[in-house]
């Protein structure tokens, strides 16, 4: 199955259908602005609408009125524009579903007429339904005289226009005729829908489907599956889902799109075979079948069945020897497009056949007795219904005549109330209360779906049964005619309610995933009240619901996100789950779904017996380290054949209780369990930890340190003495994986002890928005770590002087030595192995970290090694300019001893050796620490001290990165931020000190041009300055060699080294490197005239003043404009005099380029003049984002910070 082609088709089909429908609506005078009146020239026979004055006649006039009435009715419940959008979506998906269904039926020869509708069996361009229109007239319900004439004319002339007209009639009749056989999918077409869709076999969705999706993907005899319907549906929803995901909170209408995820085929098989299949194996064993469970599974070809672990003595299970296959009920309460139910159908068919049933009889029983499903999404319900009917049709050619209705349901919403039923007044208070309860629970059915619960006895209520049976008995007593509709609606509610109140032998689902923060209000309130243990996410709520839906001694199976296994917010749910034994779990981790990349969705599939079995040993397949869906699948299949592999674990659930928080850490060794359970000495005995501050508005109170003026930052504050004249204070805020030292990016406004932060009031609530100031812990030396990580845990030493954030947890000890010992342990692989059990979700809570067992011996060697590791990590961090302790570029560290007569390549090789030495020494020291702690904890059989290079935090040399850092340092020197003569920052706000610059003098103006050529030959040109800088630092003798080395490292195109470096500075320096180095808070801003690049230049933020833009216009833009004009004149002369065509064309191309640049400069000059006249002042305390926007005054004169 070519899923890429399927996805492309489905997405494009939706777009095409929607655009076509919008256009037809506009032609009918219906737009987002409302409904247009018919034009004055209209008559009773013909009406004109829209800007184009298009006409409609006959039945189309009536259809338009129905359409308008439908829209106005919808608009009573929502805004007009929303009603119009919803109707467009409804019409689009209605026709999409029908087209897909017809395609599946025609390929598999399931259409009652036996004639293809969308294509030709003999590969003709014209569909067979046109060629055989009169042969199948009875199948399509007959033709009117007019229809007969149109079809006959088309067959006679074969004119494309006539053929199209006939095809519209035939296609629509076929869709309506299928209503008799498949009423839930092919509902009787509302007449207005025919106005909004014109089927065509020669272009559009139908043609694309036939041409682009392989026929074999639909053909069940050629390996095709009805599951293709599910894939098409998921991909059809791609764009609505992407749009909904961007919302902070979902609407009820978003729920289907954001929660639909088609389950991979092998996971469906795993879930069904290990629940339904396992249950039947128990039946056979109780009947006396002596084969092993694996042998029985293999006899059915259940490849994904995993036998149970060998058990100690456990509680007796219920006897299933008398269980008949007809009695097994199977439910999917979040069925989507029916993937799980369809495979359950296949398995049940095997079971029936093994019991002696014919396939035909078995299929009818399965549909009528065994399978049940529910969903809130009508489209998904229709597709599941269709898929079930197709499975039935495959086994029984006469199934359409049986008028069977599979037990799959759309959970509806209703606005009905007790007062809508006249018969309700005759009921007792209890009966009336029951009816009111039923109606009330379905009030938000479209949001709550299968989460709605009932006591089954409620449907024995006399009043309810009286109302729903009255029509059948011919005793219609309604006082109002529309109460007939109410009765039918109530009957549907009762059918769905009975399905929701029932319990089932087997319950299996892939539930919707939705965090509580994004739930619509009604849903969030409901789960908070009725599912408090699992309210954090919808998937967890369904875990509880599945337990309730499953009969005692039954089995339920799911695939969910794996957070419930570990997070403290799901501890109550884990306690509830502990009542039932986990028979098997395939812990999938990331990338279990090929449609979802990255580390976001981590999943686990599991099978649970709803029977209390003391001491049950579950089997767990740890597939998290296999990095693709296919590899996980293969690893599981391998484990079935060889269950003794090192990623297959067996353990009792009672073992989880030995671990703090009781996570489902099935891979915990006996030794670690003992340490976690019995250790009396833990980190919490010697460390105090605090979750840090929440400012309430980081955008207002927090900055990257380089954004503000350096002299305003406090570096000397302690817990006992705070620098009162400073505004900004160092602030720990977690960050990426890094051990020992670093991730020092931020400062926070703590002026006057955080006066601004502590007085920031939420206007809505009247409360202070910030909290957790941790006053007595502020500015103390600490261990800090990132609360959330995308990888391993890493802790860092934080010297005195820092405040800390909620995402940068800090912990404190009574003395320096103890702090370093704890830091050493936290960064050891022993600690990591414990944290994998306590916090596998990479969300490192304080309680989990402080619960780590701690060895009592405080080795002096550990402290000595830790001091060395911190020192090495600090040296590495300070080697680059994103550190405020940066002194000089790594390639210039040793130039003095070479008397500035060296090559850049030699300098790089020296740095490379230093970096490698530091890397290797740090790695060796970390491995020595690992060895010490492994010995202290007795984990020699489980861990080895060796460390992978990727887990070493310090950096090795990297030629492209380090050359770019050198160029960045050069830019800093040009602007005076750095000086060759002054270590560290020379200027970052405050008073300019010219004495700091002797060897290389910064530009007088706060600008350096980034042009494609040297137009001035002075310090306005970036390459002129760069060559001067290279000559100053490395000597003139090596200039060309150094330029070539740098150019080669950058890898840009160009005819010379200078051209390559110039191209990098002009095209890549700002957008590709500076923005990322400074985390989208750049200190150098790029002036940019637009797409043609007529004017590009860098400015240093800290040197900006209110006259900078005016200076740029007069001293740089205008002279550059004149230079362009001179060059243009010169090029035109060259072009006129040139005889060779190739060179002449080259000149023409250059003339076109520079002409575009000049035109762009003229427009840009207007923008600059506007901004210059405003004389805008910036306050660096406001931060880069605010100032970057402010400096442009609603124009676009700077490159965006993207």
UniProtKB/Swiss-Prot annotation:
Transferase is among the record's keywords: yes
Catalytic activity: a 2'-deoxyadenosine in DNA + S-adenosyl-L-methionine = an N(6)-methyl-2'-deoxyadenosine in DNA + S-adenosyl-L-homocysteine + H(+)
Segments forming a coiled coil: none
Disrupted-gene phenotype: Loss of whole genome N(6)-adenine methylation in the fifth position of the hexamer 5'-ACRCAG-3', no visible growth phenotype. Has a higher plasmid acquisition ability (when plasmids have the methylation hexamer) but a reduced ability to retain plasmids.
MF terms (GO), sorted A to Z: site-specific DNA-methyltransferase (adenine-specific) activity
UniProt-listed Enzyme Commission number(s): 2.1.1.72
Keywords: Antiviral defense, Methyltransferase, S-adenosyl-L-methionine, Transferase
GO biological process: defense response to virus; DNA modification; methylation
Top-level EC class: transferase
One Pfam family hit: Eco57I
Domain of life the protein comes from: Bacteria
UniProt keyword annotation of Methyltransferase present: yes
Function, as annotated: BREX systems (bacteriophage exclusion) provide immunity against bacteriophage. Part of a type 1 BREX system which protects against dsDNA phage. This system allows phage adsorption but prevents phage DNA replication, without degradation of the phage DNA. Methylation of bacterial DNA by this protein guides self/non-self discrimination. Probably methylates the adenine in the fifth position of the hexamer 5'-ACRCAG-3' in genomic DNA. N(6)-methylated adenine on the fifth position of 5'-ACRCAG-3' is found in the genome; there are 1906 sites in the genomic DNA.
Family: Belongs to the methyltransferase superfamily. PglX adenine methyltransferase family.
Name listed for the protein in its UniProt record: Adenine-specific methyltransferase PglX
Originating organism: Lacticaseibacillus casei (strain Zhang) (Lactobacillus casei)
Origin organism lineage: Bacteria, Bacillati, Bacillota, Bacilli, Lactobacillales
């Amino acid at each position: 199955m070519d899923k890429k082609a399927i996805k492309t088709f489905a997405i494009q089909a939706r777009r095409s259908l929607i655009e076509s429908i919008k256009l037809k609506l506009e032609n009918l005078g219906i737009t987002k602005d409302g409904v247009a009146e018919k034009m004055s020239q209209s008559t009773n026979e013909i009406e004109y609408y829209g800007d184009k004055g298009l006409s409609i006649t006959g039945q189309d006039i009536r259809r338009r009125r129905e359409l308008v009435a439908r829209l106005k009715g919808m608009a009573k419940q929502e805004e007009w524009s929303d009603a119009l959008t919803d109707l467009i979506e409804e019409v689009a998906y209605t026709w999409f579903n029908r087209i897909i269904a017809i395609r599946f039926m025609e390929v598999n020869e399931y259409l009652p007429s036996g004639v293809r509708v969308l294509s030709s069996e003999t590969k003709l361009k014209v569909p067979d339904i046109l060629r055989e229109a009169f042969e199948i007239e009875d199948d399509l319900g007959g033709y009117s005289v007019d229809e007969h004439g149109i079809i006959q004319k088309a067959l006679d002339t074969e004119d494309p226009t006539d053929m199209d007209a006939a095809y519209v009639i035939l296609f629509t009749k076929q869709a309506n005729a299928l209503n008799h056989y498949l009423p839930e999918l092919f509902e009787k077409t509302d007449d207005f829908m025919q106005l909004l869709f014109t089927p065509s076999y020669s272009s559009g969705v139908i043609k694309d489907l036939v041409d682009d999706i392989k026929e074999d993907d639909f053909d069940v005899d050629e390996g095709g599956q009805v599951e293709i319907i599910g894939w098409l549906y998921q991909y059809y929803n791609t764009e609505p889902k992407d749009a909904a995901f961007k919302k902070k909170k979902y609407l009820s209408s978003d729920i289907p799109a954001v929660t639909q995820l088609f389950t991979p085929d092998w996971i469906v098989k795993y879930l069904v075979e290990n629940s339904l299949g396992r249950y039947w194996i128990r039946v056979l064993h109780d009947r006396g079948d002596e084969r092993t469970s694996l042998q029985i599974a293999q006899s059915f070809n259940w490849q994904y069945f995993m036998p149970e672990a060998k058990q100690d003595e456990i509680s007796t299970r219920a006897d299933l020897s008398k269980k008949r296959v007809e009695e097994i009920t199977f439910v999917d309460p979040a069925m989507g497009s029916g993937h799980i139910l369809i495979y359950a159908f296949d398995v049940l068919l095997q079971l029936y056949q093994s019991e002696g049933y014919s396939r035909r009889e078995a299929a009818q029983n399965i549909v009528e007795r065994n399978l049940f499903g529910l969903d809130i999404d009508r489209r998904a319900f229709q597709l599941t219904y269709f898929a079930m009917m197709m499975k039935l049709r495959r086994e029984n050619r006469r199934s359409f005549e049986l008028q069977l209705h599979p037990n799959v349901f759309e959970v509806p919403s209703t606005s009905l109330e007790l007062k809508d039923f006249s018969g309700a007044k005759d009921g007792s208070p209890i009966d009336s209360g029951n009816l009111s309860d039923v109606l009330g629970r379905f009030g938000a059915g479209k949001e709550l779906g299968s989460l709605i619960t009932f006591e089954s006895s409620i449907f024995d209520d006399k009043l309810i049964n009286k109302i729903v049976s009255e029509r059948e008995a011919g005793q219609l007593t309604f006082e109002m005619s529309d109460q007939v509709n109410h009765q039918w609606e109530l009957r549907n509610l009762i059918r769905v309610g009975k399905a929701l109140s029932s319990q089932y032998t087997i319950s299996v689902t892939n539930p919707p995933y939705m965090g509580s923060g994004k739930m619509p209000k009604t849903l969030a309130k409901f789960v908070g009240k009725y599912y408090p243990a699992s309210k954090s996410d919808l998937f967890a709520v369904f875990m509880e619901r599945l337990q309730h839906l499953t009969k005692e001694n039954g089995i339920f199976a799911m695939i969910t996100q794996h957070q419930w296994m570990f997070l403290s917010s799901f501890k109550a749910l884990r306690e509830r789950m502990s009542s039932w034994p986990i028979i098997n779990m395939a812990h999938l981790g990331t990338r279990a779904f090929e449609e979802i990349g990255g580390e976001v969705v981590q999943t686990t599939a599991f099978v649970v017996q709803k029977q209390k079995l003391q001491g049950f040993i579950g089997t767990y397949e740890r597939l998290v380290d296999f990095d693709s869906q296919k590899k996980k699948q293969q690893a599981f299949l391998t484990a079935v054949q060889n269950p003794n592999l090192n990623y297959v674990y067996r353990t009792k659930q009672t073992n989880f209780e030995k671990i703090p928080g009781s996570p489902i850490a099935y891979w915990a060794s006996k030794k670690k369990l003992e340490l976690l359970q019995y250790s009396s000495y833990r980190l919490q005995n010697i460390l105090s930890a605090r979750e840090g501050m929440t400012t309430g508005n980081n955008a207002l109170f927090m900055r990257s340190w380089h954004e503000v003026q350096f002299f305003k930052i406090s570096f000397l504050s302690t817990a006992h003495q705070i620098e009162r004249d400073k505004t900004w204070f160092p602030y720990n805020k977690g960050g990426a994986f890094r051990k020992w030292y670093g991730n020092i990016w931020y400062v926070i406004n703590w002026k006057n002890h955080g006066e601004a932060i502590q007085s920031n009031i939420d206007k809505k609530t009247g409360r202070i928005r910030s909290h957790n100031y941790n006053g007595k812990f502020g500015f103390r030396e600490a261990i800090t770590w990132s609360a959330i990580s995308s990888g391993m845990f890493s802790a860092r030493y934080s010297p005195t002087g820092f405040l800390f954030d909620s995402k940068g947890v800090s912990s404190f000890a009574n003395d320096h030595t103890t702090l370093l010992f704890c830091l050493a342990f936290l960064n050891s692989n022993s600690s990591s192995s414990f944290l994998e059990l306590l916090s596998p979700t990479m969300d490192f809570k304080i309680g989990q970290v402080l619960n780590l067992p701690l060895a009592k011996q405080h080795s002096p060697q550990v402290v000595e090694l830790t001091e060395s590791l911190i020192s090495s990590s600090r040296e590495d961090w300070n080697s680059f300019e994103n550190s405020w302790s940066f002194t000089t570029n790594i390639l210039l560290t040793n130039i003095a001893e070479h008397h500035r007569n060296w090559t850049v390549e030699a300098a790089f090789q020296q740095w490379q050796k230093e970096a490698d030495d530091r890397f290797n020494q740090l790695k060796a020291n970390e491995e020595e620490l690992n060895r010490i702690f492994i010995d202290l904890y007795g984990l020699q059989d489980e861990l080895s001290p060796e460390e992978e290079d990727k887990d070493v935090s310090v950096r090795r040399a990297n030629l492209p990165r380090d050359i770019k850092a050198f160029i960045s340092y050069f830019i800093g020197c040009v602007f005076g931020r750095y000086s060759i003569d002054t270590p560290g920052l020379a200027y970052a706000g405050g008073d300019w000190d010219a004495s700091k610059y002797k060897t290389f003098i910064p530009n007088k103006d706060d600008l350096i041009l980034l042009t494609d050529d040297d137009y001035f030959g002075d310090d306005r040109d970036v390459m002129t300055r760069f060559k001067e800088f290279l000559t100053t630092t490395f000597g003139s003798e090596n200039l060309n060699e150094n330029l070539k080395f740098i150019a080669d490292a950058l890898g840009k195109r160009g005819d010379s080294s200078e051209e390559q470096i110039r191209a990098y500075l002009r095209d890549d320096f700002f957008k590709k490197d500076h923005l990322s180095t400074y985390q989208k808070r750049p200190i150098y801003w790029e002036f940019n005239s637009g797409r043609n690049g007529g004017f590009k230049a860098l400015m240093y933020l800290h040197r900006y003043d209110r006259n900078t833009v005016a200076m740029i216009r007069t001293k740089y833009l205008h002279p550059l404009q004149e230079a362009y004009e001179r060059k243009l004149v010169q090029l035109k002369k060259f072009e006129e005099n040139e005889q060779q065509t190739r060179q002449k064309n080259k000149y023409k191309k250059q003339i076109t380029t520079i002409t575009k640049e000049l035109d762009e400069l003229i427009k840009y000059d207007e923008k600059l003049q506007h901004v210059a006249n405003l004389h805008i002042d910036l306050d660096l305390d406001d931060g880069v984002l605010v100032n970057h926007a402010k400096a442009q005054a609603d124009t676009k004169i700077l490159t965006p910070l993207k």
